[in-house]
Amino acid sequence: MIGILKTSLQNNDKDFFTIHNINKLTSTNTTSCIFCDNIDPNFILPIKATVLQRANAFDFRGMLITDELVRAQDLINITYPKKRFLYLYHLEWPHITELKFTHIQRILLNDNIELIARSNSHAELIEHLFKKPKYIMPEWDYKTLIEINQNE
């Protein structure tokens, strides 16, 4: 089972592709759910997967994936997931003023968190700065999510 950990779902490209591909998973044998605290009432897509409060992620035992650096700090403290992944969808860390490089290192070099890159060029940069991403997944591709679920 794949769990997606998010603060909220907003009308942006990242969340659109998240839900678009999670919805595609509902017609496969790969089960999924979303842990988040807020969904924009004007969110453009219907959500076909189970949505739970973010606090429920602390009891989750499947593959847990987040695409938010802030939530990746939670991944370090969530005890039960089978595997933890940080999907670096946007390389946004230079633009987050309150996030220091030491915080980023603690997350991106953590042995318990695997990295997922959005493209080959992102993967090369991430590997050069931190460690090699385990997967490359363009725009939350549901086929890659199935592969992660099967391989891990």
Give, region by region, the residue ranges found by the protein language model.
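A polyampholytic, Gly/Pro-enriched intrinsically disordered region
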Residues: 107-113, 152
